[in-house]
Amino acid sequence: MTVLWVAAVIALACLNVIQFIMKKKRDGNLAYTADQLSYMLSRDSAGQILLPTDDHALKDLLVNINLIVENRQQISAQFAKTEQSMKRMLTNMSHDLKTPLTVILGYIEAIQSDPNMPDEERERLLGKLRQKTNELIQMINSFFDLAKLESEDKEIPITKVHMNDICKRNILHYYDAVQSKGFQAAIDIPDTPVYAQANEEALDRILQNLLSNAIQYGAAGKLIGLTLSYDERNIAITVWDRGKGISETDQQRVFERLYTLEESRNKAFQGSGLGLTITKRLTEKMGGIISVQSKPYERTAFTITLKRMTY
C-alpha cells in the first residue's frame, strides 16, 4: 500500500511539473505572439507570426491572427491605391480644366464688356459658351468615371452579350455622321450569332469612342470600317480608318491618361485625353485586351478581344 501511495505522489508531482512546464511554454509563446503583433502593428509590417508549436489552440490563434493581419494589409493597400488615384485625378483635373475655364471666362468677358454687341454676335458667343460649358461637364464626368475604374469602386457585371447586335446598333448610331462627312463604311458583321462575356453598357461606350475617333481622324481617307470576327475561344471587334494614323512612338503611349500629343487619338474624347484610357480600363474590366496597329493613310485599327461564349 505504501508503495502505491508513493507511486501516486510521484505521478502527481510529475504531472504538476509537466503542466507547469507546458504552462510556462504557452505563456512564453503567448508573450512572443503579443510582442510580434505589437511590433507588426506599430511598423505597419506585412509579415506573419511564425511559431512552431504542438499546441492546437495556439496554432488556431496564430492562423486567425495572421489572417487578420493579412486582411488589414489588403485594406491598407487598397486605401493607399484609392488615395493615390484620387490625388492623381485632382492633379490632372486642376491642370486640364484650366484651358476650358479660360475659354469660358473669355466668352463671358467679351459679352459683358460690350453692351452694344449685336444680337447675332451675342447669340453666337452664347452658343459657344453653352458648348464649352457642356464639354467641361463631360470632361469632369470622365475624370470621375476613370477614378472609379482605377480605384475598383465601379463594378461591371459580366453577362452573355450578343455581339452582332452591339456592333450593328453602334454603327447605326453614327450613320448620319458618316453620311454627312462623305465617308464610306466597310462593315463586316457575320450572320452567325456571336456571343461574348461582356457588358453592354461598357461595350457601347468603347465602340462610340472608337467610332468617333475613326470619324474625326479618318477624314483624309474618307473610309471607316468595323469588323466582327471570332474563333473557338475569342471574339474580336476591329474599328479602322485610313486617316493620318499614329506614329510608332504614340502607339506605345496612346492609352495613357491625358496623353494628348497632336498625333495621339486620346484627345478625341471630349478633348480630355481620357477616352482611350477609359476604353482600355473598361476592356480590362471585362477580361479583354485592346491593341492598336497603324500605317498612316493605309489602315489604323483598334481591336478589342474578349472571351467568346458558346453556351
UniProtKB/Swiss-Prot annotation:
| TM stretches of this protein | 1-21
Carrying Phosphohistidine, the residues are 95
Q: Which Pfam families match?
A: HATPase_c, HisKA
**Superkingdom, natural source:** Bacteria
> How does the protein associate with the membrane?
Single-pass membrane protein
Sample GO molecular function, one term: phosphorelay sensor kinase activity
Spell out the GO cellular component terms annotated for this protein, sorted alphabetically and separated by semicolons. Answer: plasma membrane
Domain (Histidine kinase) spans: 92-310
What are the GO BP annotations of this UniProt entry? osmosensory signaling via phosphorelay pathway
Q: Main localisation, per the record? A: membrane
Residues on the membrane's Cytoplasmic side span: 22-311
| Function according to Swiss-Prot or TrEMBL | Member of the two-component regulatory system YcbM/YcbL. Probably activates YcbL by phosphorylation.
Protein name per its UniProtKB record: Sensor histidine kinase YcbM
Say which species the protein is native to. Bacillus subtilis (strain 168)
Gene for this protein? ycbM
